[in-house]
């Protein structure tokens, strides 16, 4: 049997090579040293030792005593004793082993033709080994097939793989993610629900969230491709909740509240992953600008909220970020996704966290409503309606927060009344204050409707009286004719509240104060100003005062609100007595007024009130119960359809007409704002461009820009 010491030492060299981190090799073209993988060092070392062994076989050296070891003894491990007994041979073997490495480093500058000759020589030596020592060749076939199949194609593939690995390493030593890696992770998450893969995905997700930031310097992964970035986001957002739900399922109680089993043995292992994943979502939510990605992130994030319930710091920051998106975004899909997420958070949170969420929702709505225009009005209405739905998820928390903030509104009004000044009036005479009153009016109205549907009394009903007193106090503290638009907004809110709660609110005196104002009764001056849009105006500018445009707008608003107010009680059994003061006062005013439009509108309204009074008197005369019978009185009102009454028909027709007029006014205002925006953009382009000068603008355009 031929000598095998070189093969033995080669195997030991392979074991030592696994402990080495990098093997230095001189670059063929540039003469610099490159880092190679352990696999290359292992295969190259083994290849050189086998070549030397084949050369020894071909030279037909005489075997020594120790070389007469059989192949069976070699496989049984007896070579260890033989190897320890022949330390001299081992030392010489180590010398022989180091020699090829030195030769390899010195020969890195050889041409590709010499490498091809070496490969051909290597193949010939393997053929010679097969003929002279078939037993050992068979052993290599069974245990090291890759060594026998080592050829030029494999060399190129290995080099390509090394280059790929080196390319995947950034200059800082981080792992550069690829699409193949993302696909492999996705398969593992789908099939095995691997927690190890989950941890890797969360680490990579954190790298994506903090990309190009200081926090990303200490992270393991890095991303250099936008497609990989998007694929990673989809993977982390969609599959992480699925894997979490597989190991720790989400449960739901009868009230719809979602929770998880906190006694799960897997949950403690997932806590670092959950914390990292949560703050990564938070960072993405704060930095994203694409509406589709934000909407997707919000939709999928609600699936991990039950796992995050113990992370108070994260939940508070996440709530604030979500409320900011909900209140400030212009995209409807993002807004709806944010509402769904906040609703899930309210259903998952305990009483303390729920109060925090509702408080942030209310403050976010109040902040955004401070700037009301024709463009933001629809969004503000959506914010108020969605906030009402969130508050009514828990009546107890809703009452506590409602009591607190309604009291705050009362304190602000009290300070204005006791210390009247320009600065003290600003908080009350603001859009935030008016929209807050309207929000609580909507909430209490919706709560009253729900209590009637369920047949259970609501504790929120007790907040109606203080809210009405605050609203009437704001009207009384703001008698200025410039603030008539604000008065109309508050009266609309109170009419809405009265309609849904059934509470009688005396609003006629506040409306007739406008009728008695000199801005309505006296003759106004002509003006070319555009009609004032009362829906988006809180205060009329001084240029509108005593103008025909402003007077006509006040008359339209006054007639509308008078009809809307009295139609609330159109089916009430006491309607004939209720409208007597209004009829008398309107007729008296029409006699001394010279405003034809106002007189015509007032007399038409008076005519409808008289017809409705006659209609209700006839209906009332047909009944046999006494006014003290409250149940019969309530049933009497429910048997009459208000839309089929004389006053009801008039109000429905007027609503349709006014809606068309409002639509035209809003379109006109919107076109005007768009025109101004175009002028501003044109001015910016003119300033940036060297070819366009401001002198090219027309005088009309220049005036628009100045305005």
Curated annotation (Swiss-Prot):
Keywords tagged on the record: Coiled coil, Nucleus, Phosphoprotein
Highest rank taxon of the organism: Eukaryota
InterPro entries, sorted: Noc2 (IPR005343)
Record field: compositional bias (Acidic residues): 692-707
One GO CC term, this protein: nucleolus
Residue numbers spanned by region Disordered: 15-122, 667-707
Chief location: nucleus
Keyword Coiled coil: yes
Keyword Protease: no
Coiled coil: 659-700
Comp. bias intervals (Basic and acidic residues): 18-32, 40-52
Compartments, record wording: Nucleus, Nucleolus
GO biological process: ribosomal large subunit biogenesis
Residues with PTM Phosphoserine: 112
Classification via PANTHER family: NUCLEOLAR COMPLEX 2 AND RAD4-RELATED (PTHR12687), NUCLEOLAR COMPLEX PROTEIN 2 HOMOLOG (PTHR12687:SF4)
Family, per entry: Belongs to the NOC2 family.
Protein name as it appears in the record: Uncharacterized NOC2 family protein C1142.04
Organism: Schizosaccharomyces pombe (strain 972 / ATCC 24843) (Fission yeast)
């Amino acid at each position: 049997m031929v000598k095998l010491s070189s093969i033995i030492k080669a195997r030991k060299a392979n074991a030592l090579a696994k402990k080495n981190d990098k093997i230095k090799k001189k670059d063929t073209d540039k003469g610099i040293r490159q880092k190679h993988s352990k696999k290359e060092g292992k295969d190259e070392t083994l290849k050189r030792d086998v070549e030397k062994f084949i050369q020894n076989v071909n030279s037909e050296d005489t075997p020594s005593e120790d070389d007469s070891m059989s192949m069976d003894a070699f496989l049984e491990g007896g070579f260890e004793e033989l190897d320890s007994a022949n330390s001299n041979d081992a030392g010489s073997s180590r010398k022989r082993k180091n020699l090829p490495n030195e030769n390899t480093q010195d020969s890195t500058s050889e041409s590709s033709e010499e490498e091809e000759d070496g490969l051909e020589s290597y193949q010939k030596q393997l053929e010679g080994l097969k003929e002279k020592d078939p037993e050992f060749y068979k052993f290599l076939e069974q245990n090291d097939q890759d060594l026998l199949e080592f050829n030029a194609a494999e060399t190129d593939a290995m080099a390509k793989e090394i280059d790929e690995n080196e390319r995947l390493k950034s200059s800082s030593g981080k792992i550069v993610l690829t699409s193949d890696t993302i696909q492999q992770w996705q398969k593992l998450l789908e099939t095995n629900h691997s927690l190890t893969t989950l941890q890797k995905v969360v680490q990579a997700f954190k790298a994506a969230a903090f990309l190009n930031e200081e926090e990303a310097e200490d992270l393991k992964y890095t991303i250099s491709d936008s497609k990989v970035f998007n694929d990673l986001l989809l993977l982390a957002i969609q599959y992480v909740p699925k894997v979490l739900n597989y190991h720790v399922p989400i449960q739901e109680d009868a009230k719809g509240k979602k929770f998880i089993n906190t006694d799960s043995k897997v949950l403690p292992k997932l806590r670092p992953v959950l914390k990292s994943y949560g703050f990564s979502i938070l960072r993405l939510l704060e930095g994203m600008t694409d509406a589709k990605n934000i909407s997707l992130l919000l939709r999928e994030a609600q699936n991990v909220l039950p796992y995050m319930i113990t992370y108070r710091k994260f939940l508070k920051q996440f709530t604030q970020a979500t409320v900011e998106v909900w209140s400030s975004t212009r995209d409807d899909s993002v807004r709806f996704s944010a509402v769904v997420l906040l609703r899930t958070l309210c259903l998952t949170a305990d009483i303390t966290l729920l109060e925090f969420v509702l408080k942030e929702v209310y403050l976010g709505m109040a902040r955004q409503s401070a700037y009301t225009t024709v463009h933001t009005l629809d969004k503000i209405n959506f914010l108020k309606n969605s906030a009402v739905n969130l508050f009514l998820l828990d009546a107890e928390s809703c009452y506590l927060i409602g009591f607190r903030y309604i009291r705050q509104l009362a304190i602000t009004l009290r300070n204005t009344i006791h210390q009247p000044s320009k600065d003290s009036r600003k908080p009350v005479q603001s859009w935030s204050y008016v929209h807050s009153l309207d929000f609580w009016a909507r909430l209490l109205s919706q709560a009253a409707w729900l209590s009637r549907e369920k047949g259970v009394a609501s504790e929120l009903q007790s907040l109606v009286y203080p809210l009405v007193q605050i609203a009437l106090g704001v009207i009384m503290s703001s008698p200025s004719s410039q603030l008539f638009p604000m008065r109309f907004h508050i009266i609309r809110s109170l009419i809405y509240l009265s309609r849904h709660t059934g509470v009688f609110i005396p609003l006629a005196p506040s409306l007739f104060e406008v009728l008695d104002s000199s801005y309505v009764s006296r003759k106004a001056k002509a003006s070319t100003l555009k009609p004032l849009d009362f829906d988006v105006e809180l205060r009329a500018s001084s240029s509108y005062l005593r103008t025909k445009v402003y007077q006509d707008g006040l008359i339209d608003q006054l007639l509308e609100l008078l009809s809307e107010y009295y139609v609330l009680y159109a089916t009430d059994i006491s309607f004939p007595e209720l409208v007597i003061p209004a009829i008398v006062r309107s007729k008296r005013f029409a006699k001394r007024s010279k405003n034809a439009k106002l007189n015509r509108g007032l007399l038409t309204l008076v005519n409808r009130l008289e017809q409705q009074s006659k209609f209700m008197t006839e209906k009332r005369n047909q009944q046999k119960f006494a006014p003290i019978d409250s149940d019969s009185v309530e049933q009497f009102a429910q048997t009459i359809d208000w839309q089929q009454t004389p006053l009801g028909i008039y109000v429905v027709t007027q609503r349709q007409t006014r809606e068309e007029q409002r639509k035209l006014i809003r379109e006109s205002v919107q076109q005007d704002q768009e025109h101004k925006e175009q002028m501003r953009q044109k001015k910016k382009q003119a300033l940036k461009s060297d070819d366009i000068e401001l002198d090219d603008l027309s005088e009309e355009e220049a005036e628009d820009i100045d305005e």
